[in-house]
Amino acid sequence: MLDIPHSRFEHLLSAEDFSQLTERTQSLVVDLGFDGFLYLIVTEQRPPGEDPPTFILSSYDPEFIRHYQKYHCHRYDPAAVHIRQHHYPIHWGRPSFTGTRAEPMYETARRYGLRSGASFPVVPPSITIAGFGYACDQDLETSLPHILATMPYGQLLATFVHVAVNRLLNLPSAPLPHAFTAREKACLHLAAQGYRDGDIAAQLGISARTVLFHLGNARDRKSVV
């Protein structure tokens, strides 16, 4: 039986940056018996022909993450599709992908040690999807009992990671549909003055990818007003 103190999960909320949050989350994932994790935010509302703003926090191999983003795998990955359509977690393995458009993606994932796992939605299905998942290098028929036994801890971990990411991104817990957040306003203000992404990041003390995420969301809010 697992015995992970609740304080370990609360410790995620005091992470000073995404690197520290990744390290602390990975430590918990390993203690749960898995090899790596992925947290994903995708804002589906966007102008035609443009890619949606995407934020990923992960300990998976960077090459796999690049593949996932390059081919927009969140659009057909069964775990991501489930997160977009449901409120409850799901376990996954080869059977989830067999005979689907995502089958080649699963074969790629296997090469990076991602053979089975669980995924947890952390916001209600809407124009923005957010979810957390972890995986291990075992086929589902072997790992399923352990996955099922640890899913309550996984849901708890998903919630804390989601809150920690929102804090670091300076996102409100329930933003108004068309209202800019304070951080979005700051990024837009500097962008209007001609600052580049890296300059905005330096001015605000955040990462360039966080700047891009805020600018992308701000653009989408403007497009639906």
Regions found by a protein language model. Give the residues of each.
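Hydrophobic residues on short alpha-helical segments
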Residues: L188-H189, R219
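Recognition helix of helix-turn-helix DNA-binding domains
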Residues: R196-V225
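Short hydrophobic beta-strand micro-motif common in sensory/regulatory domains
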Residues: S116-V123
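Regulatory sensory and allosteric helical modules in signal-transduction proteins
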Residues: F55-R110
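Short helix-to-turn junction characteristic of helix-turn-helix DNA-binding domains
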Residues: A191-Y195
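Juxtadomain coupling helices with adjacent low-complexity linkers
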Residues: M1-H11, F18-S19, F132-T181
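The N-cap/first-turn positions of alpha helices
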Residues: R183-C187, L212
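Helix-loop-beta substructure at the N-terminus of cytosolic sensory domains
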Residues: A15-D51
